[in-house]
Amino acid sequence: MFLLPRFVLVSCIIGSLGFENPPTNVVSHLNGDWFLFGDSRSDCNHVVNTNPRNYSYMDLNPALCDSGKISSKAGNSIFRSFHFTDFYNYTGEGQQIIFYEGVNFTPYHAFKCTTSGSNDIWMQNKGLFYTQVYKNMAVYRSLTFVNVPYVYNGSAQSTALCKSGSLVLNNPAYIAREANFGDYYYKVEADFYLSGCDEYIVPLCIFNGKFLSNTKYYDDSQYYFNKDTGVIYGLNSTETITTGFDFNCHYLVLPSGNYLAISNELLLTVPTKAICLNKRKDFTPVQVVDSRWNNARQSDNMTAVACQPPYCYFRNSTTNYVGVYDINHGDAGFTSILSGLLYDSPCFSQQGVFRYNNVSSVWPLYPYGRCPTAADINTPDVPICVYDPLPLILLGILLGVAVIIIVVLLLYFMVDNGTRLHDA
């Protein structure tokens, strides 16, 4: 209690000397228990294989290349690997998770399932996917991919119905129509199995519109049934549009178990890959760095939409991405953001990373770690120190109670002494 006035005085002196400790626009970590998922901008192996080895290709400091804390692949992303044949097995584990990827599936790629489809739907899918990834990696240490085995008792094989350019969808798989069916008004099932992970992120997708085939329109209908628990997950087409729709996906977080994929109309879909989530941890917000092209290419903001507090902190540069290796690789602003991975930091917040945990000019929003509890507000004339009022209020109450007790005791002894004098 006697130290509080000294603390106030010292803090005010520090404030008067201009110590502000503002939040910095970087991603960092509390300690060495961290991991980064990325693409070419943090893919050290890709740089090693170029000639010459030009590290200006990356936004990552090359001193981190041998840290063992990076899973990155040039030309890829977690979303791209999840849905398409262009696959990289992103794998990593840490208490503090950082993502700097996503640019390799943007409106620039203009993906849509059919010629009359919609890339806007796929951007929506991307946002929903990363929302699940970020939320779950705030409570899980480990992320990797696993194959999902399935058994279909018919003779039809999976078909590459959904493709555009070099991208071919293979998760979920489409099971082609059986030869003895004259149309798509039929019910069909397949078993699939999830095992070996704590939980899984799997896709459940439908064409949300009137799907035309041979002059007939069909409403998509897909369900997953957990045979162990009896829980059913399903989607039915609700739109009446006949053009401009595409493959709408929901991303389910499922436990291990035996499942049944069911289609009541159109083609059966069944998951073939899943995000494997392992090793529950104490809640730790993930950090996401905006992943975008130079303005010459069209980007999207889906990782920003997916990254929301309290489970996620989003970091971005205020300027156009302009690389030094080429316009899309080696930007100074994003290199600065990733430079925070070179050191530990005590406090993370929505506004940025705090380098010190004593006082700050900014109150941390959605704080995590050992964060400043006071703010130093500099006016043009004199520094004014503002502190958490609770300790001062409690101190005032205690002092008030002490004063009252002292006054009561003084009155008591004065009255008692006067009475005894009178009696004498």
UniProtKB/Swiss-Prot annotation:
The protein's enzyme class: hydrolase
Gene Ontology MF: a single term: sialate O-acetylesterase activity
Catalytic activity field: N-acetyl-9-O-acetylneuraminate + H2O = N-acetylneuraminate + acetate + H(+); N-acetyl-4-O-acetylneuraminate + H2O = N-acetylneuraminate + acetate + H(+)
Record: active site: 40, 326, 329
Bilayer disposition of the protein: Single-pass type I membrane protein
Listed transmembrane segments: 393-413
Segments of this protein annotated with the region Esterase domain 1: 7-127
Function (record text): Structural protein that makes short spikes at the surface of the virus. Contains receptor binding and receptor-destroying activities. Mediates de-O-acetylation of N-acetyl-4-O-acetylneuraminic acid, which is probably the receptor determinant recognized by the virus on the surface of erythrocytes and susceptible cells. This receptor-destroying activity is important for virus release as it probably helps preventing self-aggregation and ensures the efficient spread of the progeny virus from cell to cell.
Protein name: Hemagglutinin-esterase
Organism per entry: Bovine coronavirus (strain G95) (BCoV)
Gene: HE
